[in-house]
Amino acid sequence: MQQNVIAGIGNTPLILLQKIVPEKSANIFVKLEWANPTGSMKDRMAMAVIEKAAASGKLNPSDTVVEYTAGTTGVSLAFVCAAMGYKFHAAFSDAFSEEKRRTMLAFGAKITDVISDNKKITATLINEMIATAKKISEQPGHWWCDQLNNEDAAKGYHSLGEEIWQQMNGKLDAFVHCASTAHSIHGTTEILWKHDKNIHIAAVEPDESAVLSGRPTGSHKIEGIGLGFIPPLWHPELVNEILTVTTDDAKNMARRLAKEEGIFAGTSSGANVVAALRVAERLGKGKNVVTLIVDSGLRYLSTDVYKF
């Protein structure tokens, strides 16, 4: 019997979308990452980076873990820290949902806020949050996760890639997923391509801030993706194409998933499915596309995604 709650990370369900996929399109399977302990895929990354830092001696038992976060990573780090006996200090912002703030606080986190420009997610905001986290980490007994530059983060998603491969019995034609730090899409791809290099990989970013596509930075409201700049560990050779999705389309799809499929998800998950539908239409009937339900809609009840 596993005694620690972090043993609940991973082995999440993979299901076939039943209603929103057109008849002549490929099948779309979604991996329900909200089945992880905190309700998001980021639990995988948080466990990986903290365990590696502790094993290497960078993180000591009495230390405080520090990170900038749009909330999902922060919740997962706060959770793993609570389970493993560390403290956690987040650089956060009012641009992100209140549910994420309250969940971090529930796990005992300390939060330093960086005020946004009318709750817009911009490159300026993200860079200010990163600078805040760096400054906090300069205190004695503090270790900065520094997810943007932390190569252990992508390794946390190797289990995700292996689970997808096994659950699909190797019958997978495309994987579609949003890019932020790029760790989740790259870590998953590394394993999928280890099994089959012919799997088509499509990265997704906000249309309003499509910097990976070579367009100007801008503001958007798809929480958790679209940094507004190219992340340091972005590897374009690990994707076959980049698709863009508008904030409105992502929000509308999140609502459709709830009403039509019974899947309660956040906006980035909506963006994933919008993009997956495009790939599925192109591939055609008989092919298989996998994407992720990144986190639960419960984290967005205070936002306009679920205000009716």
Annotate each language-model stretch with its function.
Residues 1-308:
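PLP-dependent amino-acid enzyme catalytic core
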